[in-house]
Each structure stands twice: as structure tokens, then as C-alpha cells.
From Swiss-Prot:
GO molecular function, one term: zinc ion binding
Protein task: Putative RNA polymerase II subunit B1 C-terminal domain (CTD) phosphatase involved in RNA polymerase II transcription regulation.
Bias (Basic and acidic residues): 209-218
Keywords assigned by UniProt, alphabetized: Hydrolase, Metal-binding, Nucleus, Protein phosphatase, Zinc, Zinc-finger
Localization: Nucleus
Organism classification: Eukaryota, Viridiplantae, Streptophyta, Embryophyta, Tracheophyta
Gene3D superfamilies reported for this sequence: 1.25.40.820
Source species: Oryza sativa subsp. japonica (Rice)
Family affiliation: Belongs to the RPAP2 family.
Keyword Transferase: no
Chain sites annotated for binding Zn(2+): 66, 71, 107, 111
Name of the protein in question: Putative RNA polymerase II subunit B1 CTD phosphatase RPAP2 homolog
Major site of localization recorded for this protein: nucleus
CC per GO annotation: cytoplasm; nucleus
Amino acid sequence: MGPTTATDTGARMKPTTVASAVHRVQMALYDGAAASREPLLRAAASLLSGPDYADVVTERSIADACGYPACPNPLPSEDARGKAAPRFRISLREHRVYDLEEARKFCSERCLVASAAFGASLPPDRPFGVSPDRLDALVALFEGGGGGGDDGGLALGFGASGDGKEVEEGRKVEIMEKEAAGTGEVTLQEWIGPSDAIEGYVPRRDRVVGGPKKEAKQNDACSAEQSSNINVDSRNASSGESGMVLTENTKAKKKEATKTPLKMFKQDEDNDMLSSCISDSIVKQLEDVVLEEKKDKKKNKAAKGTSRVGKSKPAKRPVGRDGHEVDFTSTIIMGDRGSEMMDHGALGQYNFSSSILANEQPSSSQYAAIDSVQAYTEELDELFSNAVNIAKDETSDDSGRCTLRSSLKAVGSKNAGHSVKWADENGSVLETSRAFVSHSSKSQESMDSSVRRESAEACAAALIEAAEAISSGTSEVEDAVSKAGIIILPDMVNQQQYNNDYDNDKDAGENEIFEIDRGVVKWPKKTVLLDTDMFDVDDSWHDTPPEGFSLTLSSFATMWAALFGWVSRSSLAYVYGLDESSMEDLLIAGGRECPQKRVLNDGHSSEIRRALDTCVCNALPVLVSNLRMQIPVSKLEITLGYLLDTMSFVDALPSLRSRQWQLMVLVLLDALSLHRLPALAPIMSDSKLLQKLLNSAQVSREEYDSMIDLLLPFGRSTQSQASLPS
């Protein structure tokens, strides 16, 4: 690379590619086009990759300029930096070594950090599929043909003039929202839009409603919400219903709102979204009510034969102390089953009458308000009924007008023991509330059931605790049950029934049968102490354990039990040098039955064998050094491996110390010295070395001999070997 002053005119006329655009941008950055103009450098991030930017930094540092393209400063001179400046720097505080070769490409630490951050933000590869117009605009921006300016990042199609208005530098995109179509004929340009327009832009307020099709319904609902008082019961709103009380001004202002549907959205954006959400919820609730009305009519036809719906009482609008009217309120009272049919029959009606505990008579203006509210409700119902094409039955006085579902009962309620009644039909609320006293017995039953539930949960928790302890292997079944606090009582009911059946069928000669042979045996799962009140000592397996008794095995018992489980017939045959035909003669060895080799199918035997090989390999070199053996360790390992191949590994390896593992290996070598490794016989007969090793493992000579008897049940003399069954 080298500094350039002009670009070839013929190259500019050719179609711009990504590679050529990257090269021209690199040359511009090399010449200092982005010096003191970081926005212009950020604009290059849309085209450059990480390696491309690294090349720019390297070339600028070779030209004795700061590697950061946005920095106009040159690199420090050799005298300022020092001729023998080290390449690496060791930080004693951070315990790290820093390479100063990269830092020499920049004039300061600030430029080093800024360049590293900018390079890390670039993608590893160049962009693919960039339009030629965008490439030309970007190249022109760096070469001075795109308007320049500090705000270079806006040159990719947008710009900003001094007064803040948008100036077209490339392609200008303008977002336009379609206005509401007016009445009459429109031109094709107005109906379709510009030829280069892009469809798909949806205003934010229409995203909530669901599209322009519901715009008229949304505007009507918004106008009704803003010009009327709507009280929505939160308990009924969750189930899709809302209790609404509308004033008399609703009908009068409805037409005004429909004439100017778009003027209402000229307010603040947050208020528009809030009002649209409220109106949309009301529209959906009313539509759901109309859709469910058809299902309710089928239920009403079945209920007409048994009950008829009476007309509701006229509403009473009380007057407050200050002379103003009181809003409509409703009182929900739980009644008996007899009143359920009346509520079910009137389920499809909007009843705006309320039970007001007052004696004042409503005025004529209040009656007029009620009539206007009912009239507007009819119009709303007709509007949504026509939308879903539901035919209305107007055959009787009770269902003379299209009605909506009452908001006093939740949709889908299946509680047949409750109903909704007006307070003025059953008297005062205080008198009706006395009916709840009869439910005291039910509350007592629920309390008993809760106690039983808690007891069952406690039992389940104890059983889970005992099962986890048993499955983990930390304790036996009896100990786990005892620790969990579970006491297993004998089944006295079944025992008594069994005794009665036995007494009826027994013979005269069987009177001397013991009690334990006649009934269900009561065997507790844990040891019984003398101070227990639940069982007698006679019912337990054994008496109280003596003082100082412990179930923990000693180190010798642990090693002896491990050898006892490992030895098989194949092991004895290998130790005595017998073939497979003589293995059946080793069925009884040393007065006990010697089992065959067992291998677990789940692969645990091989895992135990690999773990044992590790323990043997760790203990064998130390043992060879202490006993001064002249046999190579490799030969000892091979012979011990053949012996381990004949053993059964079913249980987990015991937890032994290194001295104890050395003693276990010594027992195996002592058994192999009889036939397989006769060179070890003089070493094994040295009592001083053997006793020293036994003392370190805390095992006596008698205990060692008992372990040898497991592998040499027929003795170690040659006469004993010759007398083996053949």
C-alpha cells in the first residue's frame, strides 16, 4: 500500500463490487479520511471485516502514523520510545506477560484500546449481497463525493441538514400511513398507492386491535368509553364478562364519534394505546356473549317445561345525601337450589335493576336514563348479532328483545348448590347472611380432612426418607425405618380374624399347638429395648444388645470378608496348579463349599476389577522394596493378574489404607509362592520381615494365617498338594 491522491476515473465507471469497495475504503482510511471523524469510521464497519481492518492498522503503523484511523497523530519517534525498548513487559502485580509489539503501532494507550474495541466489533468475513448503490454511496462518502461531514454514518441513504430536516443523499425511504377511504369514486393511484410503495407497514394502534377491518368497531367502542361511565367488575372480567352501566349521553354521542373516527387518535401515543386496549376488550367481550347466546337458547328450551322466568322488579335509583344520583350497584347473595332455575332462565338477560337498601322513589329523569341505557344495549346487541349471523327468536314476552348474558354469574360454573338472587327478593342482606351458619358442620369436616391430609403427607415424607436411605446403601432396612420414625404395628385385626377361623376348624388333638404357630407372626423390624411400651421382649428377634456392642467391623474382619467373597474354585485350582477337569473335586474345601466364579451382567464386575488393579499396582512396588524381592515387578503383576481373573467380584471394594492393601497383596503372593512363584518361598518364610509388615497393618500372625487358609485350604506342603483329589 502507499498513499493515493486520486482515483482512476475509469475504475469509478465500472460496477462496484464488495472487494473493490473494501479496497477503496482501506485506501481512504490509510490516507487519513477518518482522522478526527469517528462517525465516519463507524460507517466503515458495515463493509470491513476484522482482517481488513487489521491490514489498515499495519499499513498505517509502517507509514509512521497511528494505527487507529480516527487518530491524526503520528507515532512517537525512535528517540522518544528508546532504541533498546523491550518487546515484552512483565506485570508482577497481575502475574502476566504483555507483548508490546502490538502497542508500538499506536501513539497512546487510548488509541490501542479504541482500536481493539472497534476491531472486535467487526465480523470475521465481509458482507455478502450488498447492493451496488449502497457500495457507491459508501465509497463516495469516504472519497469526498457524498457530502462528507462529521456525521458520516447518515450517508447510507439518509442525511441531516442544518435545520434538522432530512436531506436525500442516496435513496430516501418515506413511511406513509393510508388515510381512511372516503365516499365516492377514487382514482387508481389513490386506491393502490405509488408504484414503488412497500406494503406491510402496520401502525402501532392497529397491531393491538388486529388490523384495519376492526377500525370502525374500535372507534365506536372508544367513543362509547370516553363519553360514558363504565364500571367493570374485576371478578367477572377474568371470565370474559363485564358488568357495564352506561349513562344517557351514550346514545347521543355515538353518532358524533362515528363521524370523526380518526381525530380521536391525534392525542398522545400512550393514551391512544390505552383507550384502544379498553375498547378492544369490550368489543371482544360482547362478541363472545353473542356467540354463547345460541348455546344458552338450547339450554333455555329444556328448562322452559319446568320453570318460567318472571319479570324483574323495576330498578330503584336512590338519591344520596348530597342530592346526586347513586351509581348502579348489585349484591350477590348465595341462595338455595330452588332459586337456581330462576337464575338459569334469566341467564341471557341484561338486568340493570339493582337492590338498593333505600326507601326513596326514583324520579322521572332516572327512569328516562334507564330507558336510554336499555335502548342502547339493544342496538349494541343487534350490531354484533348481525355480524355473526345469529337469528333471534322473539316469540315470547320474556325473551322479547335480544338480550345478553348476565354478568352476575361466571361462564362455565358447575356449582349446582349456589345461585344469584336480588337482595330485595329475600329481604335484607343481614337476614340472608344467617344462612351461612348451617355450613359450620361442613367446615368441621373440611378441617378433619385437612388433618388427615397432613398426616398422610407426613407418612409419605417418612417413607420417602427411608426409601432414599435404603437405596443409597447408607443404612439397612431396619435402621432406615427406625431413623425415619416409622413404627410398624402388628396387624391385630387380621390376627383376631385368623384366630377365630382357626378355632372353628381346629381338631381336638391340636390343643397343644403353640401360640406362635396359630396366629400371624409378629416380628418387628428393629431391635426392641427393655424400656419400650410398644412391644414385649418376647416379640423381638433378640434381646437388648450388650454394652459396647458395635456393628462396625475391624480392619482384619473387613479384609477377611473381602477375600472370602473373592475366592472361587478357579482361584484354588490356579493356586494349586490344577486343570479344569479337577475343579469339581474342589467343591468342598476346608469344610466349606467353594462357589464358582460369578460375573455381574451389568458390567459392575469389570469396574470393580479395574479399581482393584489400581490398588494392587500402587501397593506392589512398595511391598517389593520392603521385602527385598529379586523378581521383576512386571512378572509379579502378570501372575497376580491371572489370579484375579479367576476371582468373583460382586460387592464393592472395601475402604482400606495403603498398609492394609499391601497386606492383601502379600497374602496373594504368599499363596502364589506354593506353585506359581516358588522363588518367593524363602522370602515368605522370613518371620522378621513378615512380622514387621504385619505390625504396620495392625494384624496379628494368627489373623494372617486365617486369611492364608482361605486361599490354601489344603495346606502348603507338597504332600498336601499330592493328596488333592484327582
